[in-house]
A protein has these predicted regions:
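Flexible, glycine/small-residue-enriched loop-and-beta-strand segment within the central core
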Residues: 54-61, 78-90, 94-162, 187-202
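C-terminal/domain-terminus segments
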Residues: 160-185, 202-203
């Protein structure tokens, strides 16, 4: 109970300290609508490098105020950034050091290691066939979902949905949706069985 009270006090302090950033971002949104993300980019970059617990709560307060739905029980570590206002992050989620979250829904108790990239789908800069064929390249942003209780290892790249209770090994690239309750590793990420210290790929 005491710990929760302290967390809420720090949460409020974080909001107060980040008020200038919150006000500037909301004003940009009111004036420019969905296209207004320049101030958002500036603010998230500045706040990402504020150190110590002060920075953690300033980032939390800022994203709680300007994003679609951010739990006050989430944690944003040093260097972490959220790229889009419509991102949602559940209670107990930890956004690791230098992790970037794109257009995503992050479930409760999701843990990310350092340097994880949760990007907005596979086609942000067009499809390969468009580029190879010399066609006009159309940007496309897809919302990705990471299910609750999943753990994503250091430097993993997530371009598709991750089910609940999953483990994504460090350095893996999730290119296609992966079902719940599995361990995945590699580039592209594949499901593996880990028993007695041995790894066997599942077909």
């Amino acid at each position: 109970m005491v710990k929760l009270v302290f967390k809420r006090v720090f949460f409020v302090i974080g909001i107060i300290l980040s008020l200038p950033f919150i006000a500037a971002t909301i004003l940009e949104s009111l004036l420019l609508g969905e296209k207004g993300e320049k101030v958002l980019s500036w603010c998230k970059e500045i706040l990402s490098i504020v150190p110590t617990v002060i920075g953690e709560y300033m980032r939390l307060g800022y994203y709680w105020a300007v994003c679609k739905k951010i739990s006050p029980d989430a944690l944003f570590m040093f260097g972490s950034m959220v790229a889009h206002r419509h991102t949602t992050i559940g209670a107990g989620a930890v956004i690791g050091v230098f992790t970037i979250v794109g257009y995503a829904d992050i479930g409760e108790n999701v843990l990310t290691g350092a340097g994880v990239s949760l990007i907005s789908g596979k086609y942000q800069h067009g499809k390969p066939e468009e580029r190879a064929g010399g066609k006009e390249i159309g940007e496309r942003y897809d919302r990705i979902n990471v299910g609750r209780n999943s753990w994503i290892g250091q430097n993993a790249i997530i371009m598709a949905n991750v089910g609940e209770n999953c483990t994504i090994a460090a350095g893996s690239v999730v290119y296609k949706d992966v079902p719940a309750n599995g361990t995945y590793m590699g580039n592209p990420a594949r499901k593996v069985n880990i028993e007695l210290g041995q790894i066997a790929k599942e077909n």
